[in-house]
A protein has these predicted regions:
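Hydrophobic alpha-helical transmembrane segments of polytopic membrane proteins
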Residues: 222-260
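Transmembrane alpha-helices
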Residues: 143, 147, 180-213, 236, ...
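Transmembrane-helix boundary motif in ABC transporter permease subunits
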Residues: 85-115
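Transmembrane alpha-helical segments of polytopic membrane transport and secretion proteins
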Residues: 1-31, 254-274
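Alpha-helical membrane-protein architecture signal
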Residues: 60, 69, 73, 77, ...
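Periplasmic/extracellular loop-to-transmembrane helix junction in inner-membrane transport proteins
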Residues: 8-21, 45-89
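Generic hydrophobic transmembrane alpha-helix motif, especially the helices
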Residues: 116-152, 156-160
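Short cytoplasmic-facing helical segments at TM-TM junctions of multi-pass membrane proteins
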Residues: 156-199, 222, 226
Length: 274
């Protein structure tokens, strides 16, 4: 038997990986727990007026009440539904347009100045005109989310397509790739890491635009919950809503978007798994 045929057993890494995940979780949670402890100490020590800032117990109690009566679930469902629709529409339009801009110098030259102009407008800047065009409700909020995502994803798609080396395209063409094959086997896989990064960034903008739009243009959603609580001086509801908004985004980003971006870069990008 040759020495090349012998494969020494690899050490089990499941325990090491589990320990690393545990350490990462502790490192992530420690600052949050410290912030909560500091919050409680300040409120108790200085006897802060609950209308100015509530204590931890009041926020927890309010949170449990909104969960039990179904209010929180209703607001979360409305907000997530709007984000899903607005983001999906933006992705469906922005990726083809970004690919077209990346493949055609003429299209890119014509549209790039428009992209630079509109990309500096924050999603919330569209709220006034969105309510004029679509009224108060789903249409206006979806339009705000669409604009928050569209330009980011389109621009990142353009960067991804433009970054594909020309020799790679020529090599694929010399092997007979053209048209649909070139697009699906070379262009899109090469641009995918940038596209996923754009989607991740755009969703962050969409989430912020959503909350702002819901404060003005609807009567259900997490943003509306915060705005309504403000009218009744319910600071405990406001703080709880802010915590929920942050938790939802962290869950989406850490459990869905970040792993997707990492896997995409490892599969089609310029890095390897270590």
């Amino acid at each position: 038997m040759s020495s090349d045929s012998f494969q020494p057993p690899r050490p089990a890494l499941s325990g090491v990986s589990g320990y690393r995940r545990f350490v990462a979780s502790v490192v992530f949670a420690a600052p949050l727990l410290a912030l909560i402890a500091l919050w409680e100490v300040i409120v108790r020590t200085f006897d802060v007026n609950p209308r100015v800032f509530p204590d931890v117990e009041s926020v927890v109690r309010t949170g449990l009440e909104t969960i039990q009566d179904g209010t929180l679930i209703r607001h979360i469902g409305a907000s997530l539904g709007r984000v899903a629709v607005g983001t999906s529409l933006a992705i469906a339009v922005s990726i083809p347009l970004g690919v077209a801009m990346g493949l055609s110098r003429g299209v890119s030259s014509f549209l790039t100045p428009l992209f630079r102009f509109f990309s500096v407008l924050a999603g919330i800047a569209w709220i006034p005109i969105a309510t004029l065009w679509f009224g108060y409700g789903f249409g206006a909020i979806t339009f705000v989310i669409f604009n928050a995502v569209f330009f980011v994803v389109a621009y990142n798609t353009l960067l991804g397509v433009s970054s594909i080396p020309l020799p790679l395209r020529r090599a694929a063409a010399s092997l007979g790739a053209s048209g649909w094959t070139m697009l699906t086997q070379v262009i899109l896989p090469g641009a995918l890491p940038n596209i996923v990064t754009g989607v991740r960034t755009g969703l962050g903008f969409a989430w912020r635009g959503l909350i702002a739009a819901e404060m003005i243009a609807t009567n259900v959603g997490l943003g509306y919950m915060l705005f309504l609580a403000r009218d009744f001086y319910r600071t405990e509801v406001i703080v709880f809503g802010m915590i929920v908004i942050g938790i939802i985004w962290l869950v989406l980003d850490r459990l869905l978007l970040a792993p997707l971006e990492r896997a995409t870069i490892e599969r089609w990008g310029m890095v390897v798994r270590t």
